[in-house]
Amino acid sequence: MENQKRVYSFGAGKAEGRADMRNELGGKGANLAEMNLIGVPVPPGFTITTDTCNDYYKIGKQEVIDLLRGEVEKALKSVEDLMASKFGDVENPLLLSVRSGARASMPGMMDTILNLGLNDEVVEGLARKTGNPRFAYDAYRRFVQMYGDVVMGMKPVNKEDIDPFEAVIDKVKEEKGVKLDNELDVEDLKKLVRLFKEAIQQQTGKAFPTNPMEQLWGAICAVFDSWMNERAILYRKMEGIPAEWGTAVTVMAMVFGNMGETSATGVCFSRDAATGEDLFNGEWLVNAQGEDVVAGIRTPQQITLEGSRRWAELQGISEEDRKVNYPSMEEAMPEIYRQLDTIQTKLEEHYRDMQDMEFTVQEGKLWFLQTRNGKRTGAAMVKIAMDLLRQGMIDEKTAINRCEPNKLDELLHPVFSKEALSSAKELTRGLPASPGAACGQIVFFAEDAAKWHADGRKVVMVRIETSPEDLAGMAVAEGILTARGGMTSHAAVVARGMGKCCVSGAGAINVDYKNRIVEIDGVVLKEGDYISLNGTNGCVYKGEIRTEAAELSGDFAALMDLCAKYTHLQVRTNADTPHDAEVARKFGAVGIGLCRTEHMFFDKEKIVAMREMILADDVEGRRKALAKLLPYQKEDFKGIFRAMDGYPVNVRLLDPPLHEFVPHDIKGQEEMAQAMGVTVEYIRQRVESLCEHNPMLGHRGCRLGNTYPCITQMQTRAILSACIDLKREGFDPHPEIMVPLTGILYEFEAQEEVIRAEAAELFKEEGVEIFFKVGTMIEIPRAALTADRIATHAEYFSFGTNDLTQMTFGYSRDDIASFLPVYLEKKILKVDPFQVLDQNGVGQLVKMAVDKGRSVRNDLKCGICGEHGGEPSSVKFCHHVGLNYVSCSPFRVPIARLAA
């Protein structure tokens, strides 16, 4: 452990790291090293490895400091030499930034500290060195504010309170009679530093550290601590980032965007992160530091002239006003803009992906502080991948791999109805930070959003600006609206990464946290009122607006065609209605992997006949009721087979226990008694007789069919007679009849005999034959263990992984919520096994059944029909074990196709 290299230096075109060292140096550290190596101007610095973060939690803070001390001091000396200044020196001071950097991008989730190394003596030296006392004290007050928050824990006491430092700033500005931070003079900034330190001492009981090395170690440890803060943990859960990855810490020489009118800071993207358009775009602020842009504290200006004009149009600002008061960087700093544009092109070509970059201009010199593959919306993800393919920057397989299956879901989100929009009341407009349509009730705080969401309410978070502490609320909100911040603010970047609708920088809104109201151009809305956001054009509307299905782009279709070219795993859908079948077919499904017949029985007329069949006390009574059901079932099947013309439709025979279909309330029992001409008491007794202690392991599935063969006969006749009618109409139906819940070969044999006998009788009556297959669901562990025997009769297997998971783990799907959070928290389980297939247990049963089944029937078709069929990692496992297809709900078909 002691001999392990933990610190990697970079600067002046040299670096000890490379882009492929993300695991060791995190994304930020690896890319800073790489930028040095390809000639991009980057301030010198060093990166502490992710392994050190893990050691920090294993062996403790002081032990890690002792391990790091020698390497950090050596690396710091290298930075001092390159910058020709000295850390902590009162005449020629070097200031540092300390930033986090995990191997996967986690924007805003961990902590950053700027201007580190200042104290009352060093700040005077900085003022003399730069000849700019205002800049020096502005840097000092920013450092005390940031360090006090991140390292010393200065937070608002109550959620309604504003940041304690901002409260001090507001008070000083009020006393001075000014509105903007940059209107404060040197004496005001000195006063802020003093008041900040007093507030820290009062709230934390600790004095602000004056020793620069003590500050540095405090900052490094604070970044390691931030790996385990609540928002970082939540973000990792959302993104599937393992805790054991850890974060790196990057320490860099400070360059300053707040040294006057020739200095600036900004964030830019090589392509539009919201739409995917091939347009360089970004935001900048003159005389500011990077956190001002990202945190949304000030609404910045646009980098490009085109972007600036588009922004002004959205804000209702005239071209004359824009030129004078809101010029683009392209206009205000043309030479710096040219350099920036050249380097962003170079970086995108080098990484062959859309880049998200941070930069600072210090007195006319451009420095890059970061580049990373940019977070993007689902729509942008698809467009960027297909554009890069067309531009020859990536190949077809790379284009497929660049698209995250779960983000395709965003493309399928509804949009506002054009008809409904025509009569909607527009309140204001902001920046279209993340596209989509969102309707919900206004909430102002993250914890309220989470609580309301848990109660089943749709919410829209309204904030002055968001911070990483708001992540839990943003995660459950339908959309986010902010008064401040631009297209690169925290709200915008995180919302795009989550696929959430977001409107930012809506300057006309006035948010009052204390009274929980928001005023928008004279209209007052309170917490709980409905609001609608259009993240595509930045419009904000009062009330709820009706939505409709989104239209899919040509790039989406092209991506799906690529997927079909490179996969051998077919994707079917789980569908019980013609509409669902049509939707799935539009998304590329090549059949139905699960058609549940029980859902067809719950219409008003059908349920009466179904209940008559269940409650009948003899075979004749059941046959009479089933005769009523037959035409209904037949028509239902005709609609589904018609929608899936030419593709296989796998129909599962009746599966649920019968008690699910009978009335359990007095009124329903009275109506049933009247319809059947029997007493209420008779109905009550029959209903009670159907109740079971453990119905999911009771009288259901093939056990029903074997107890009441007439049910199987009716359903077989309905399926095949529907197909005969369609064949006569010129359609090409492909029926598959599936016996559910088989555990013993003889259960299946008995049902197969009934099915084939009924089919033979029907074909003789009609003078027409239909080719069909009979298979079974493998959802009982015993069926997997004896799959070779079952395959001697079954023509295909469909794995019902929902029930197979339930019976393998012994977990009830309906009751797991009572202990699952504890199991996930304690890492007893890594994921919910009903969401992600358990490959080591349930998955091995699937593999065993496939291998055993094909050992006796080499053409055995195998598929999966649980909702695992639409979960990307589960789909990949299905491909690995040799399944022929996966089946999932219609709107997850594109996700499964991409994952396959």
Which ranges hold each PLM region?
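Extended, non-globular alpha-helical segments
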Residues: 429-469, 520-558
